[in-house]
Amino acid sequence: MRVFLDTNVIVYAHDRAEIKRHPAAVRVIDALLTESDEVVISPQVAGEFVNTMKRKGTPPATLALQIRGLSVFELSSPTLSTISAAWALCTAHSIAWYDAILVQTAIDARCDKLYSEDMQHGRKFGGLEVVNPFVQR
């Protein structure tokens, strides 16, 4: 199984101040890295992670280590075809533009699941299912 991570899951895994979500995010990422064939992020996710952690006041040396830590994930970059298909998703499914880019990048990377709290848990886009790891099951 191939999975795609949205920024919020990675941020919560690094931000101990997120008392409710931090432990869950760490457990989810650890499990995915152990059990999945590949855990994928995009440059958009990496950039949003850096921006968010910088805004939260993470010291530069710590952030540099966190950035290097992202190398455990496969990086999948969107193409112009991805952007075109994302626009079609955005208009057909009424989802936010940047969410559509993430969804299409995950689809292009042949992922089965997209872990995010920003979209409806269980929603499907073709063979890709959105999983909110913070939903009580």
Please report, for each region that a protein language model flagged, where it lies by residue.
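Acidic, PIN/NYN-like endoribonuclease modules and their adjacent C-terminal/linker elements
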Residues: I107-R137
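Histidine- and aromatic-rich ligand-binding microenvironments
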Residues: D6, I41-S42, I95-A96, D118, ...
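Structured helix-beta-strand junction loops
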Residues: E35-S36, V72-F73, H93
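Hydrophobic helix-cap positions at the C-terminus of alpha-helices
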Residues: A31-L32, L70, L89
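Short, well-structured N-terminal submotif of metal-dependent ribonuclease cores
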Residues: M1-I41, R55-T62, R137
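Active-site neighborhoods of divalent-metal-dependent phosphate/nucleic-acid chemistry enzymes
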Residues: L75-E117
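Glycine/small-residue-rich phosphate/adenosyl-binding loop
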Residues: P43-F73
